[in-house]
Amino acid sequence: SGKDVTCIARGEHLAAIRGNGLQLHSDLKGEHCLKVAAFTAEEFQGKADVIFVCVKGYSVDSITELIKRASHERTVVIPILNVYGTGPRIQRLVPGVTVLDGCIYIVGFVSGRGEITQMGKIFRLVYGAHRSTIVSRETLEAVQRDLQESGIKADISDDIDRDTFVKWSFISAMAVTGAYYDVPMGEVQKPGKVRDTFIGLSQESAALGRKLGIEFKEDIVEYNLKVIDKLAPESTASMQKDMAKGHQSEVQGLLFDMITAAEEQGIEVLTYRMVAEKFK
């Protein structure tokens, strides 16, 4: 779409993107080799109008210096992580920058050096400002326009706290169920104990959300089932992939943080406690 996009990468992925472009295999977009600018965090000296934060939750602290350096007075930062509360967390780390919050619905993974694969028909980005964040409607709509012109479904949220919690609830149930049983999502789509575990996790996070004062637009369990049933049957969560490879994973943010938050609110989470025994 002709947008000026820069990727921050490192190691063999950076070398591959610089040498061969970013290789994209996509059920939605087809096969592409994208010639995109790529730098290490240390090399990048430019200023960005919009910064999408796509690292895993455990790496957020490592990018704060880059965000500070790459921001100008009108920059907006949009985290699209899986873990709830990321926007306020980054805002505390970079108080001089406008940080929104967001989440993304997509099944994608790194399939090789400088190569990503997107599966299925889901690709939607949701973002918005927390109540204490001052940002103009014009800025929010400008970001939406750029995303839509790039073929991305983009929604401006009127309650980003709710929408990021809903995403956390979904991805937590998906990743934890998949990792606990070591199965792809096709097994969650069938009636039986795997699907029942997914439902139990969804019910428990929904109870936590209600206790936190979040007003859901629809039943969160039905919503999570609707999303899971749309996924390609062979898809797995990134936490699952990382654990299978012995890599660092998001198990803290997607499993143990949910249990901690429930404890703080006096919510009983028997299904979460059951699956947590496997990962202690």
Residue ranges and their predicted role:
Residues 148-149, 199-280:
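NAD(P)-dependent Rossmann-like dehydrogenase/reductase catalytic/cofactor-binding core
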Residues 22-39, 171:
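N-terminal glycine-rich dinucleotide-binding loop that anchors FAD/FMN and/or NAD(P) in oxidoreductases
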Residues 71-74, 116-130, 179-188, 235-245:
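Helix-loop-beta segment of a Rossmann-like dinucleotide-binding subdomain
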Residues 46, 82-163, 167:
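Rossmann-fold dinucleotide-binding core
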Residues 1-30:
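NAD(P)+-binding Rossmann beta1-loop-alpha1 motif at the extreme N-terminus of oxidoreductases
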Residues 161-189, 193-206, 232-233:
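Active-site-proximal catalytic alpha-helix in oxidoreductases
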Residues 31-115:
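Rossmann-like NAD(P)(H) cofactor-binding subdomain of soluble oxidoreductases
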